[in-house]
Amino acid sequence: MFRGSIPAVITPFSENKVDYDSLTKVLTHLIDNGSHGLVPCGTTGESPTLSHDEHKKIIEETIRVTDKRIPVIAGTGSNNTLEAIEYTEHAENSGADAALIVTPYYNKPVSYTHLTLPTTPYV
């Protein structure tokens, strides 16, 4: 489904806030230089340190800037299963092509039942 160079996108900050103008420049640079897809909000993009609003806006901005020219694989993983589901549903509803969901780190679910929580077919 995916092939080629699909970099994890850094999240630029300025004065302790996400710098969305610089994010647009980074995304444009990656697209203009031949990336075959983009992965915003992975751990390289500082996802564990982002607020929920920042996380969602970065996904939305990436989808807007790519404008369907290349796939967007949204980083939606979290230690919190319900948060991962929320991020994944948001990514799907915003137009992401796929989601990158990491296995919970630092703590683990006590059983497989967390996998039976309501999700969309997108997960």
Regions found by a protein language model. Name each.
Residues 1-2, 68:
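Residue-level preference for short coil/turn positions at secondary-structure junctions
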Residues 2-3, 20:
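Onset of an N-terminal alpha helix
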Residues 14, 20-115:
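Active-site beta->alpha loop and helix N-cap motifs at the rims of alpha/beta catalytic domains
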Residues 114-123:
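Single conserved hydrophobic/aromatic residue that forms the stacking wall/gate
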Residues 3-14, 41:
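Generic N-terminal amphipathic, Lys/Arg-enriched alpha-helix
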